[in-house]
């Protein structure tokens, strides 16, 4: 009766997010479902997920491969839409936003950090960090100043002119974090940020994320590694598309 147990757990965990509207939450999801149709079969990647995230939260979303955690991360990042349910971001209903509003959110309000870094191989660290500023039309002189400041904030001030193949894995991830920070977003989404790094470098990257949280950033990371999740202040566990546990560590 595992399904029934998970549904009961989901209903209990959703109590705080059951009422309509965003309240004081930075993020509120209410009864999110994501269903894919493959031939005659329906695959439910998310099954009625509801939770609130207050400002300045440090949250880890954990679960095994195929649990739905990356699908949920894509929803939070406005990269995908639910089959049903609602998502409020900064008090606004995401389903009512047009393409320009969504593009603005992805560029200005959310900073993305990916497992594979997603850096342009022929561009310098400085130019890679400038890219979000180029997309939103920031003037060149201000753009360079902001990109330099972001790289200095992740201790890469001396590597601005280096290309990705001239940097270590940890340095590449620092460039990716600087790129996520450059627009001063309210939320940083990190999808398996240490997945391609050794244990020592992983700890360095997590200490950097810890520091960014202490500076007031909302950090949401997806991971399957429990030692990485332990850096967060709150952990939501996903199993078979549902929340199986929502616990506060500190």
Regions found by a protein language model. Give the residues of each.
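ABC-family P-loop ATPase nucleotide-binding domain
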Residues: 1-35, 245-250
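ABC family nucleotide-binding domain
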Residues: 24-239, 243
